[in-house]
Amino acid sequence: VTYIAVYRLLNELLKDKFGVETTIVDTTDIEKVKAAIRPNTKLIHIETPGNPTLSISNIEKIAELAHANGALLSVDNTFASPFNQRPIELGADFTVESLTKYINGHGDAMGGAIIGKKEYLDIIRAQSQINLGATISPFNAWLIMRGSVTLPLRMKQHNENALKVARYLKTVKGVSFVAYPGLEDHPKHDVAVKQMKNGFGGVLSFGLKADHDTYNRFVTHLKVITSAVSLGHDESLIVFLGENDERQYLYPEEFHNGFFRFSVGIEDAEDIIEDLRQAFEKENLI
């Protein structure tokens, strides 16, 4: 599972406009990745943790598989951030980072970065960047550079808060599931521990034992947490997802009836948990 804009880029734009063939595969299962490789496969792209299911793919094993078959590996590292996970050190050829999210960290600038060997980046710069115009504005670049200075401090707090919130959510009777790689019962927790050296990031997903109307009412009760898209900001953001999503067939079954993606901010963890608690209480979910 990957970010919906990337999903559409791979399945629609590149396919329809440029004739690039794409195979969608569950990259948490190395055998499925192996089975999907074709003689003309040039690139394997993964996102780990995955958006929005928090699935974990084994970067080292997929890198070995890609290189054994003459392909390159790119890793979208947005949910982890470079503070927690460094894919190139694990064998990836490219790391893709959304500068908009954790690296900037304040929700006030947009940008992206590709990290890799100079021989590849020179081609990207000479062809894609110049011809397609994917260049960041000077002001956005300045904001992101300013925000990046505090990345380690912020990520430590995101990591700590998200784990506390995930553990709290596991105790709430009205919560149907919690997806967070830092929880011991996450199906790929052992892989996450190995490749996410400093923590598991600030994003988690959870479902409610409730109907759609309850989801809608729940967010209206929140006072500290903001109901909004995006993630990786200093403030906590929550968004309802899952219904009418073309990627739903890729989701585990528990995600099919809708769920919240929760980007846990750097507010005091007790304030975040209390905000959730009082909202749950108003909907008789605790």
Positions of PLM-derived features:
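Short N-terminal helix-initiation segments at or just after the protein's N-terminus
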Residues: 141-151, 200-210, 280
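PLP-dependent enzyme catalytic core of the Aspartate aminotransferase-like
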Residues: 1, 10-12, 16-17, 35, ...
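Generic non-transmembrane alpha-helical segments
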Residues: 65, 164, 168-172, 217, ...
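Conserved PLP-enzyme active-site core in the AAT-like
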Residues: 1-174, 179
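Short acidic, gly/pro-rich beta-turn/loop elements at beta-sheet edges
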Residues: 122-124, 214-216, 272-274
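Conserved C-terminal alpha-helix-loop-beta "cap" of PLP-dependent enzymes
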Residues: 177-260, 264
